[in-house]
């Protein structure tokens, strides 16, 4: 089942250093799940998965912020 943005509620805004594995965050206009976090000298490398099951890596700076979402039931 494809989840749409209305299936989620924005509950907070997190700094990059507050992210945890399993968080649902907004990146690039979509809501993705954080699969892994690796520190870099300027920030973090995030392994992410979108709602189509596509996985990717994205580098973020330590001063970047992200909307945190929870699923609506």
Regions picked out by a protein language model, each given a short descriptive name:
Residues 16, 37, 51, 63, ...:
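Generic structural motif
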Residues 21-22, 44:
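Short, hydrophobic/aromatic-rich segments at coil-to-beta transitions
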Residues 22-25, 66:
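Generic structural signal for buried aliphatic residues
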Residues 1-20:
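Mixed-charge, Lys/Arg-rich low-complexity intrinsically disordered regions
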């Amino acid at each position: 089942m494809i989840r749409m943005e209305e299936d989620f509620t924005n509950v907070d805004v997190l700094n990059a250093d507050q992210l945890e594995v399993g968080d649902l965050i907004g990146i690039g206009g979509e809501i993705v799940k954080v699969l892994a976090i690796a520190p870099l000298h300027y920030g973090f490398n995030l392994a992410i998965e979108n709602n189509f099951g596509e996985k990717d890596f994205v580098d973020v700076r330590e001063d970047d912020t992200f909307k945190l979402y929870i699923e609506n039931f």
